[in-house]
UniProtKB/Swiss-Prot annotation:
InterPro entries in alphabetical order: HD, Homeodomain-like_sf, WUSCHEL-like
Residue ranges the UniProt entry marks as DNA-binding: 4-68
Pfam families for this protein: Homeodomain
Naturally occurring in which organism (per UniProt): Zea mays
Bias (Low complexity): 83-99, 251-262
Subcellular compartments: Nucleus
Entry GO terms, CC: nucleus
Keywords: Developmental protein, DNA-binding, Homeobox, Nucleus, Transcription, Transcription regulation
Name of the protein described by the UniProt record: WUSCHEL-related homeobox 3A
Cysteines joined through disulfide linkages: none
Classification lineage: Eukaryota, Viridiplantae, Streptophyta, Embryophyta, Tracheophyta
Length: 262
């Protein structure tokens, strides 16, 4: 059986060279007249038909669009990778700056008030795991306590002590609450200052420890320092028990009246 000749177009190198030169010169979609002229010119270099010229230009435009699309996709991917890298760079910067607060917290232990250090070691000589930043905070707070008490508070302290002491002393203190109690205030001012400083330090320590424990409830149990476990001591500024001043005053008045009648 005779074989039918193939209808597939096999362009020669000369035909391809001419077509590519025409495409680079700006010919993209030739019309029917131009296709006929190109086909007649290329027929000198081999077998060719008008439909072959038409499909060649169509396929060449499609391949060029595909190449352009690939270039654009590669460029977009590169830009996206650069944006991801720039967005990840600021996120890693807080890790490097996180060492600054730790250094500041470690350096705060150098500014601890000497009185607080002495008071802490005197009351808790076994406490070696005390937090340095809390100790520095206590030192700053205790350093702000005024060394001079309010005269009215001093007078009330003297009056309370005089009432607790007895009737005669209460009468003398009542006659001069601000003047007569100066000696008692001078004698107990140092003790009151130490007790008040210790109380103020423990209150601030308790507040800071409470805030720290509240923030660490989710992370785990926080071990409180010994100063926060100690209950607060309340100073008795006013007497809580009856001192019998009325009975003594009534007895003294009755004795004075009996002597006057005699």
């Amino acid at each position: 059986m005779p074989q039918t000749p193939s209808t597939r177009w096999c362009p020669t190198p000369e035909q391809l060279m001419i077509l590519e030169e025409m495409y680079r010169s700006g010919v993209r979609t030739p019309n029917a007249a131009e296709i006929q002229q190109i086909t007649a010119h290329l027929a000198y270099y081999g077998r060719i038909e008008g439909k072959n010229v038409f499909y060649w230009f169509q396929n060449h435009k499609a391949r060029e669009r595909q190449r352009l699309r690939r270039r654009l996709c590669a460029r977009h991917q590169q830009q996206y990778a650069q944006q991801q890298a720039t967005a990840a760079a600021p996120a890693s910067s807080p890790n490097s700056s996180a060492t600054v607060p730790s250094l500041a917290a470690g350096g705060s232990s150098a500014g601890v008030h000497p009185a607080v250090m002495q008071l802490h070691h005197h009351q808790h000589p076994y406490a070696t795991n005390f937090m340095p930043h809390q100790l520095g905070y206590m030192g700053q707070q205790v350093a702000t306590v005024p060394p001079v008490l309010n005269p009215a508070a001093a007078g009330m302290v003297d009056l309370a002590a005089a009432r607790a002491g007895g009737g005669n002393k209460a009468t003398a203190a009542g006659s001069g609450a601000y003047g007569g109690g100066a000696g008692l205030y001078n004698s107990c001012s140092s003790n009151q200052l130490e007790e008040w400083e210790a109380t103020d330090a423990m209150e601030h320590c308790d507040a800071s420890c409470g805030a720290a424990s509240g923030s660490s409830d989710e992370g785990g149990a926080l071990q409180l320092p010994p100063c926060c476990r100690r209950p607060l001591k309340t100073l008795d500024l006013f007497p809580t028990k009856s001192t019998g001043l009325k009975d003594e005053c009534s007895s003294s008045k009755s004795s004075s009246c009996s002597t006057s009648t005699n």
